Curated annotation (Swiss-Prot):
InterPro entries: Dymeclin (IPR019142). Belongs to the dymeclin family. It comes from Xenopus laevis (African clawed frog). Transmembrane segments: none annotated. This is Dymeclin.
């Protein structure tokens, strides 16, 4: 494709590319295609390489946009690709490298061209470009074939039917990337696309029966986490006799461009993490998230979302009364293992959220696991490093915890799992702590971080809801976890007093004043009192349901008993304070009777004895604290920009000009 090219700048002068985009039609049978497609490359793996590639070929692509209505060369290139893919499965089985090599190169060029098309012309115009043939200017033959649907269908077939081998890795990655590129029109629209011709092609017609197989294959690509084969290890190995036809063809026709791109160190050097990651697994996961978040309508539900919602475990032999046509079976054990291992990435956390929220089969399976710590610990680590994470990742991690805490079995079992030496928790050395106590510590830390930095009410609400769901099942709380619960209450009470003082001063200052309105301290006070009420309910729930299991909680409560005095007569808290007040009074009296200067051990002993003697009927019953996560209306307004921001930032070898992106701001997330 570029025998004489030596730099990226010269791409725009490359004779083969100029001919493809020029004013002359090229027949599908011409030797030109063999020359065009005979180059060696590794697909660009970072956006820096892709940016250089796009800038180098932009003028070529624009020429093709201008000339294609007359030449039909885009359609010719696509037909050449389609013809090369017809024997692809057999080629993979027979290790026929030449066929796979040329099919990959054709798809790579198509992908590069269409990526520029999507930023330059509308969806409707793009589809029109697929219909142009080499006839009179502007003529097209819409009836003879639907080349666009043919391409989509071919890409899906390729992904689901070609086995994943070293030999086929690059073309499978390119096929997944091509589908992402075809769907990327959403990036260039501020509003969510509800009517998209490309979406309709994917969700109807020939592509529809392949929905479940595509979703299953993308999930398995994520599960397998296959590393990219070493560059050159699977493409045209030189024979001992000096190289066969294939090697000679590759090296002879294709010196230049792609070696500059990939071996010459163009662009930024990848980090060790990038080098070790699986491009195909990452790209497959991104495509799966894009597909499952496409908008649907009552008359045309999103089949990809249905597939994600209804798939089952391979060991599940039950028969659904109303089976979904897009359901399938997959190994849940393998899926669970990969989900546990991959939580450092936003997209893996978003997949976990999606499956827990939408697929009841996955949720039931996860909650029944005996090694829940393998999933929960990575989620807690995300929250612990809240300063380093984007807000969306933190939200997803938090909502996952909220969904898990809706289950009483989960809330009980996490206190039975004992962990040793949590190295990433640096506030205090935790030589031994239950998973439940660690979860409480991390959630409280998230609340405190939010109070001092972001002040996001939504974050507060979800943190407190998770603690509330757990509170009746608190068991053997670690002394530090109990202290942090009371410390958080102390922080809230100080904040309450400060806002109350500001509100009082504001009221005095505003009397007789006609100046601009002052801050709404009444609203601030209302918010802080809601949070305090919630914390009191959490403490009360623990005391009324599991006091005898939590001597450390009673100890922490007694140690800071003066904190609660100001709320005893407060109209917003009087009812909930009755139980807390009674517990404080009961145990304070027992400690007085036990004598002065008691050691910590002796105090805990008195508390344990008192817990048995405490008359439970004197504690007022309150409704059980139960909060359930519910997606807000029009969730696509949040999830579609989020998914595409992940594609933009994490897509392998994908670059879009930030000035063209309308869907989200560059600092969002």
């Amino acid at each position: 494709m570029g025998a004489n090219s030596s730099t990226i700048k010269e791409l725009s002068e490359n004779e083969y590319l100029k001919k493809l985009s020029g004013m002359d039609s090229i027949s599908e049978n011409e030797p030109f295609w063999n020359q065009l497609l005979s180059f060696t490359l590794s697909t660009p793996t970072n956006s820096a390489d892709s940016k250089l590639l796009e800038e180098g070929t932009l003028s070529i692509c624009k020429s093709l946009i201008e000339n294609n209505p007359r030449t039909g060369n885009l359609g010719a290139l696509i037909r050449v690709f389609l013809s090369r893919t017809k024997e692809l499965k057999i080629s993979a089985e027979c290790q026929n490298q030449l066929f796979i090599w040329q099919a990959h190169n054709a798809l790579f060029i198509i992908c590069c061209l269409i990526k520029v098309f999507t930023s330059q012309v509308s969806e409707e115009e793009l589809l029109l470009h697929f219909t142009y043939r080499a006839t009179d200017p502007g003529n097209y033959e819409a009836d003879t074939e639907d080349l666009f649907e043919e391409l989509l269908f071919c890409l899906i077939q390729l992904i689901v039917e070609i086995p994943l081998l070293d030999l086929t890795y690059s073309i499978l990655l390119e096929a997944v990337t091509a589908l992402i590129v075809l769907l990327s029109y959403q990036l260039f629209h501020k509003d969510i696309l509800h009517e998209s011709p490309i979406h309709k092609h994917l969700m109807n017609g020939r592509c529809l029966p392949y929905t479940s197989r595509l979703v299953k294959t993308l999930l398995y690509n994520f599960i397998r986490q296959e590393k990219s084969p070493p560059p050159g290890s699977h493409i045209f190995p030189q024979q001992q006799d000096g190289g066969g036809l294939l090697y000679g063809l590759a090296s002879g026709v294709a010196s230049g461009i792609w070696t500059v791109l990939t071996l010459g160190g163009v662009g930024s050097k990848p980090t060790p993490q990038q080098e070790q990651s699986s491009p195909l697994a990452n790209q497959s996961l991104l495509l799966l998230l894009v597909l499952s978040n496409l908008t649907d309508s009552p008359d045309c539900p999103n089949p990809f979302r249905q597939s994600v919602t209804f798939f089952k475990n391979t060991q599940d032999s039950s028969v659904s009364p109303t089976p979904n046509p897009h359901s399938f079976q997959i190994n849940f054990n393998s899926l669970y293992t990969s989900l546990c291992e991959q939580q450092k990435s936003d997209q893996a956390t978003l997949l976990l959220y999606t499956l827990l929220h939408q697929n009841s089969n996955v949720r039931t399976y996860v909650l029944a696991r005996s090694d829940m710590e393998n999933l929960v610990l990575p989620i807690l680590e995300i929250l612990y490093h809240v300063e380093e994470r984007n807000s969306h990742h933190v939200y997803m991690a938090l909502i996952i915890l909220l969904i898990l805490t809706e289950d009483d079995g989960f809330n009980r079992s996490i206190h039975e799992v004992i962990l040793k030496n949590i190295t990433w928790y640096t506030e205090r050395v935790l030589t031994e702590i239950s998973l439940g106590s660690l979860l409480i510590l991390v959630v409280i830390r998230t609340i405190q971080f939010n109070m001092t930095r972001t002040r996001d009410k939504y974050l507060h609400t979800n943190c407190l809801a998770a603690l509330a769901n757990m509170s009746a099942q608190f068991r053997s709380l670690h002394q530090y976890a109990a202290q942090r619960i009371i410390s958080l209450f102390s922080l809230l009470s100080k904040k309450h007093n400060k806002v109350l003082e500001q509100a009082t001063q504001s009221l005095r200052g505003s009397l007789g004043s006609d100046e601009s309105p002052l801050p709404d301290y009444a609203q601030d006070l209302n918010v802080i009192e809601e949070v305090i009420r919630m914390m009191l309910e959490i403490i009360n729930s623990c005391l009324t349901n599991s006091l005898h299991h939590n001597p450390n909680m009673v100890y922490a409560l007694l140690y800071k008993r003066e904190l609660f005095e100001q709320f005893r007569s407060h109209p917003s808290f009087q009812d909930i304070m009755q139980n807390i007040d009674m517990v404080i009074s009961f145990f304070s009296l027992r400690l007085e009777q036990a004598g002065a200067d008691l050691s910590v051990e002796r105090v805990l002993e008195v508390i344990k004895q008192g817990a048995v003697a405490l008359p439970k009927d004197r504690l007022r019953k309150f409704p059980e604290l139960k909060f359930k996560y519910v997606e807000e209306e029009q969730p696509e307004e949040f999830f579609i920009p989020y998914v595409w921001s992940l594609v933009y930032h994490s897509g392998v070898g994908l670059y879009w000009n930030p000035q063209d992106v309308q869907l989200f701001t560059m600092d969002s997330g």
